[in-house]
């Protein structure tokens, strides 16, 4: 499947000039996008809880209208839902749905609420996604340095005939068309691939691999600090190499011993059982089973999540990691 990649010449920021662009939420993603849009010359309104920490921060940043969410949505031409997945449905119902005008564009940075029909917008608005592929602080830093981070766009609903142009204009306002903005056919591709990556690889899979490797060496009598360096700390070196030049480049930089040992032993760790587990993870995402479980967890006050996070914080890996980080923070006398 070919993926179309767009650059600056493919996007027109004038599509948004003279329009009211309202950003709901002022966390890492909301603040980064709002500031970049502001610096790109757009008329930005930030919608947050009155007099809360985000309200005060947005006021301090300046150059934007700061107001409540309902007022931010009213008369807005573009509304960006830059809020946590779990809070979006309630905020949409209370503040967005009653105030969203006909012909407006509703933008998401993650497709969860649309994919699983937790939000069902009216047919007379555009529904788009502009999803930067980086955390908010990295987006802002790249923009300030005159570049941008790659982004993904998708159109779920094109009521005006301009939905794609608006999505590309938002990407340009963030600097993402300088890097490259790629288009997918629907929100599902972003939603399900993002969830899968988080659960099976980036957050779930990698953390478990690190924890298990560390504990294996400790159980064999190795000093925890040695186990930490080998099974956790040095992962950054490998990821940096892959990011810099790809997987083959990483292998070429490694010693011959590391190459041979890694290539001949990796299937003992990631094997058919692992593949079956990944397929089951995807099945639960694809069927909506994970969505239902996550919504129930949120409704129950995140009790299981808090308990699991507490358990993670007590791992020997965490204590050893703090000791290792302290070594790198020592200052010369």
For each feature predicted by the language model, list its residue ranges.
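Active-site-proximal catalytic alpha-helix in oxidoreductases
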Residues: 161-165, 175, 180-220, 225-243
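NAD(P)-binding Rossmann-fold cofactor-contacting core
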Residues: 32, 38-61
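Rossmann-fold dinucleotide-binding core
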Residues: 107-199
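Rossmann-fold NAD(P) dinucleotide-binding segment
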Residues: 69-119
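A short, basic/flexible loop-to-alpha-helix module at the beginning of a structural domain
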Residues: 1-18
């Amino acid at each position: 499947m070919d993926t179309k990649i767009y650059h600056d010449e493919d996007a027109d920021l004038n599509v948004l000039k003279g329009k009211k662009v309202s950003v709901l939420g002022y966390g890492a993603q909301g603040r980064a996008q709002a500031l970049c849009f502001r610096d790109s010359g757009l008329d930005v309104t930030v919608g947050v809880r009155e007099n809360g920490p985000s309200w005060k921060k947005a006021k301090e940043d300046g150059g934007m209208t700061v107001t409540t969410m309902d007022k931010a949505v009213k008369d807005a031409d573009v509304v960006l839902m830059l809020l946590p997945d779990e809070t979006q449905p309630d905020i949409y119902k209370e503040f967005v749905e009653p105030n969203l005008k006909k012909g407006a564009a509703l933008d998401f940075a993650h497709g969860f609420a649309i994919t699983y029909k937790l939000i069902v917008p009216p047919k007379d608005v555009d529904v788009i996604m502009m999803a930067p592929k980086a955390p908010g602080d990295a987006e802002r830093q790249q923009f300030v340095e005159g570049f941008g981070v790659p982004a993904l766009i998708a159109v779920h609903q094109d009521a005006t005939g301009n939905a794609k142009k608006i999505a590309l204009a938002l990407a340009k306002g963030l600097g993402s068309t300088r890097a490259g903005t790629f288009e997918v056919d629907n929100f599902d591709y972003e939603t399900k691939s993002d969830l899968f990556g988080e659960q099976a690889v980036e957050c779930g899979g990698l953390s478990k691999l690190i924890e298990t490797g560390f504990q294996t060496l400790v159980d064999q009598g190795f000093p925890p600090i040695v186990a930490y360096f080998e099974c956790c700390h040095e992962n950054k070196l490998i990821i940096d190499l892959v990011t810099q030049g790809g997987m083959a480049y990483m292998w070429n930089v490694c010693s011959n011993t590391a190459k041979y040992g890694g290539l001949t032993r990796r299937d003992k760790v990631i094997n058919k059982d692992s593949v079956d587990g990944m397929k089951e993870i995807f099945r639960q995402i694809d069927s909506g089973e994970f969505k239902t479980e996550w919504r129930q967890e949120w409704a129950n006050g995140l009790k299981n999540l808090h308990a699991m996070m507490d358990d993670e914080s007590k791992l020997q890996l965490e204590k050893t990691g703090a000791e290792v980080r302290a070594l790198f923070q020592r200052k010369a006398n």
